[in-house]
Curated annotation (Swiss-Prot):
<dbReference type="InterPro" id="IPR000860">
    <property type="entry name" value="HemC"/>
</dbReference>
<dbReference type="InterPro" id="IPR022417">
    <property type="entry name" value="Porphobilin_deaminase_N"/>
</dbReference>
<comment type="subunit">
    <text>Monomer.</text>
</comment>
<protein>
    <recommendedName>
        <fullName>Porphobilinogen deaminase</fullName>
        <ecNumber>2.5.1.61</ecNumber>
    </recommendedName>
</protein>
<dbReference type="GO" id="GO:0004418">
    <property type="term" value="F:hydroxymethylbilane synthase activity"/>
</dbReference>
<dbReference type="InterPro" id="IPR022418">
    <property type="entry name" value="Porphobilinogen_deaminase_C"/>
</dbReference>
<dbReference type="GO" id="GO:0005737">
    <property type="term" value="C:cytoplasm"/>
</dbReference>
<keyword id="KW-0808">Transferase</keyword>
<feature type="modified residue" description="S-(dipyrrolylmethanemethyl)cysteine">
    <location>
        <position position="242"/>
    </location>
</feature>
<keyword id="KW-0627">Porphyrin biosynthesis</keyword>
<comment type="pathway">
    <text>Porphyrin-containing compound metabolism; protoporphyrin-IX biosynthesis; coproporphyrinogen-III from 5-aminolevulinate: step 2/4.</text>
</comment>
<comment type="similarity">
    <text>Belongs to the HMBS family.</text>
</comment>
<dbReference type="Pfam" id="PF01379">
    <property type="entry name" value="Porphobil_deam"/>
</dbReference>
<dbReference type="Pfam" id="PF03900">
    <property type="entry name" value="Porphobil_deamC"/>
</dbReference>
<dbReference type="InterPro" id="IPR036803">
    <property type="entry name" value="Porphobilinogen_deaminase_C_sf"/>
</dbReference>
<dbReference type="GO" id="GO:0006782">
    <property type="term" value="P:protoporphyrinogen IX biosynthetic process"/>
</dbReference>
<dbReference type="InterPro" id="IPR022419">
    <property type="entry name" value="Porphobilin_deaminase_cofac_BS"/>
</dbReference>
Amino acid sequence: MLDKIIRIATRQSPLALWQAHYVQHLLQANHPGLQVELVPMVTRGDIILDTPLAKVGGKGLFVKELELALLEGRADIAVHSMKDVPIAFPEGLGLVTICERDDPRDAFVSINYAHLDELPAGSIVGTSSLRRQCQLRERRPDLIIRDLRGNVGTRLAKLDKGEYHAIILAVAGLKRLGLETRIRYAMPAEESLPAVGQGAVGIECRLDDNFTRQLLAPLNHRETELRVCAERAMNTRLEGGCQVPIGSYAELDGDTLWLRALVGAPDGSEIIRGERRGPAENAEQMGVELADELLSRGAREILAEVYQDNPPL
């Protein structure tokens, strides 16, 4: 059966193509002789670039077209950045593999300033993420936070043209594109709690495709799977998408999982934080329990207001 060609559905951005080539390499390293080809496509999130992500709305903004290719048999697997993967999947599809996680932190990128704390009052900082925006505004209410869309290269070009004094990007994305020299510093989780699944690559396929699932099995990284499971369980309970002010980050120390999370008002006026420690085998339960705690402490009201202020187009 190794004469079968495995087709990877992927977005066309440089970062998405890097991730698809990465999975292609892993598959061929684990299964010598296997033919793997890429099927690049454009998603709705790639097309609508003149509107803030929160207002574009809709869960699965960057994955629906890829999932349609799976359902129609035009591709065998879809490779996603885990922070873009919705909490629910179309019938017949599922997330079957999570590859080893890269650095999940946010990156502070600036030409003239080495640290967020060095930015003068009134400096303009670019990010499209409500999660990043609320944490920035809490820490530095004197800054001007402006939306920033486009792929990594486009965002860096806007910084270089002087439209922003600093921008916030993902460390993993910059490293994968060979742009780590642009990182002034990686922001610790205490300063900017990462997004759910940030830094991890996930693989989706048809659940009845046992041949492909067997090929993918060696690519799954158990530690990453447990960490992301806790983060996604929390996000699922909060009914969050990838365009809401929710942060969640799990670390594993031996068999003990440490899960931190936050829900914040986009203006930074209120951020509700919580954490849990427990056996890694209870990762999903911990995520649900932490979400319930945040909801009981006011997260429900914050999220309701976010959805009201940013109705999907």
